[in-house]
């Protein structure tokens, strides 16, 4: 069995080196402009998270789960949160370190695989911010269970995830269904996995809504709100016809 999470770590390092849009940190000017009524962060590509989902950040212990890249954590730090970022990409974490040193705020930076037990005590955080990233893990139930464990009672989980539509198709033109869902390359012919990694896509999975939303509920969370979203311009063609992403707010 391949160590697919290490492949994905290396893939994100390469994307970051090549200037992936999710690896470009906020500028000093953008950081300076952040205020309680003036900030925007993304769980999914286009729609910024409603401010009321955060419930106030000053003094709150916040975990950015698979949230490296220097885009969200600087905002949370500027708003007074006590921040920890956890990611499996060295390059994404290097960017977090660079921005924190440039702006002079403290942050705990931890490299790790979210398919393993998170290196935190039970009930360590008030809020977890988890943007689209569980497409890179096979077992999302484990991720939701770990989120529940490390959140304090009454804590908030803000999560973004793919709804699976992106995995139905291999090419944009024409839009022809070629894959069964849920998409799991580890259970498919070896050639499909080799094609995915050779194309520089890493090893990606789709997950059902039973896994994504049902998994949060099964872990013990109470779902409070959600919204749908699409790719930005130039993204997958299917986004012109239907939303591909969901963001959820859940409470422990």
Q: Where do the language-model regions lie?
A:
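A short acidic, Gly/Pro-enriched loop at the edge of an enzyme's catalytic core
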Residues: 115-128
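A short SAM/SAH-binding and catalytic strip from SAM-dependent methyltransferases
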Residues: 126-141
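Conserved class I S-adenosyl-L-methionine
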Residues: 156-190
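Short alpha-helix
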Residues: 203-226
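Conserved alpha-helix/loop element of class I SAM-dependent methyltransferases that forms part
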Residues: 26-60
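Core SAM-dependent methyltransferase catalytic element
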Residues: 219-221, 236-252
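A short glycine-rich, Lys/Arg-flanked "PGG" loop and its adjoining helix->strand segment in the class I
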Residues: 141-156
